[in-house]
Amino acid sequence: MASPSKGNDLFSPDEEGPAVVAGPGPGPGGAEGAAEERRVKVSSLPFSVEALMSDKKPPKEASPLPAESASAGATLRPLLLSGHGAREAHSPGPLVKPFETASVKSENSEDGAAWMQEPGRYSPPPRHMSPTTCTLRKHKTNRKPRTPFTTSQLLALERKFRQKQYLSIAERAEFSSSLNLTETQVKIWFQNRRAKAKRLQEAELEKLKMAAKPMLPSSFSLPFPISSPLQAASIYGASYPFHRPVLPIPPVGLYATPVGYGMYHLS
């Protein structure tokens, strides 16, 4: 029969996994060995109460995989380094271009900073909000000054203009002497007054045209007068020797619709 000390020597608490006990078959010794095996199993479990309380960590077996991966990484590292060096040796251009672009960008940024610091150099001239001055027509330097007519002279000139718009040489000389004016002053005043009268007359005619303008559009017209259709037809038909008898045309009226003008018969 196997003794407990022998069982303890065969199984260690640090081993993981189920352990096989070499002992006799079923019997009292076999039962004790099974109980010892269960006790060893319980004590060897990493999540058992004893293991958690004692804070013992089971030894981890060194797996061969990390060693293999480390050796593979060690062998690949020189290959990568050699490939990187060859790529650098074959293509030196791309390495130089970033530095060139960086230098160009820095120069551009410096130019932009200088442009921002010196606004008066590149900025357009400021706009002045002063009101624009109206440029008056320049008169001739040798122009004669305007004649300051008095009120009595203006009334006499207006009265004479209403009587007669054109004065003869004798009338102008007599009239100018009566007003203490020169003949040239009287002649120029009458010329200006006639031009003013013409402008007033044209304005009055334009007002009359606007007042007499029909409400119908100018493109709309009837081929015959609405007031006397029979009379107009008889006049036009009498001048032609072989005219057809004119049929009586009923009087028509106009009415306005949202779309346009229509005609309807008057009853």
From Swiss-Prot:
InterPro entries: HD, HD_metazoa, Homeobox_CS, Homeodomain-like_sf, Msh_Homeobox_Regulators. GO terms for biological process: activation of meiosis; anterior/posterior pattern specification; BMP signaling pathway; bone trabecula formation; branching involved in mammary gland duct morphogenesis; cardiac conduction system development; cell surface receptor signaling pathway involved in heart development; cellular response to estradiol stimulus. It is found in: Nucleus. Residues 62-71 have a biased composition (Low complexity). PROSITE patterns: HOMEOBOX_1, HOMEOBOX_2. The keyword ATP-binding does not apply. GO terms for cellular component: chromatin; cytosol; nuclear speck; nucleus; transcription regulator complex. Keywords: Craniosynostosis, Developmental protein, Disease variant, DNA-binding, Homeobox, Nucleus, Osteogenesis, Repressor, Transcription, Transcription regulation. It comes from the Eukaryota. Residues 142-201 bind DNA. Its main location: nucleus. Residues 136-146 have a biased composition (Basic residues). The keyword Nucleus applies. Residues 1-71, 116-147 are annotated as: Disordered. Signal peptide: none annotated. SMART domains: HOX (SM00389). Transmembrane segments: none annotated. GO terms for molecular function: DNA-binding transcription factor activity, RNA polymerase II-specific; DNA-binding transcription repressor activity, RNA polymerase II-specific; RNA polymerase II cis-regulatory region sequence-specific DNA binding; RNA polymerase II transcription regulatory region sequence-specific DNA binding; sequence-specific DNA binding; sequence-specific double-stranded DNA binding; transcription cis-regulatory region binding. Interacts with MINT. Interacts with XRCC6 (Ku70) and XRCC5 (Ku80). Acts as a transcriptional regulator in bone development. Represses the ALPL promoter activity and antagonizes the stimulatory effect of DLX5 on ALPL expression during osteoblast differentiation. Probable morphogenetic role. May play a role in limb-pattern formation. In osteoblasts, suppresses transcription driven by the osteocalcin FGF response element (OCFRE). Binds to the homeodomain-response element of the ALPL promoter. Belongs to the Msh homeobox family. It is linked to Parietal foramina 1: Autosomal dominant disease characterized by oval defects of the parietal bones caused by deficient ossification around the parietal notch, which is normally obliterated during the fifth fetal month. Parietal foramina with cleidocranial dysplasia: Combines skull defects in the form of enlarged parietal foramina and deficient ossification of the clavicles. This is Homeobox protein MSX-2. It comes from Homo sapiens. The lineage of its organism: Eukaryota, Metazoa, Chordata, Craniata, Vertebrata. The gene is MSX2.
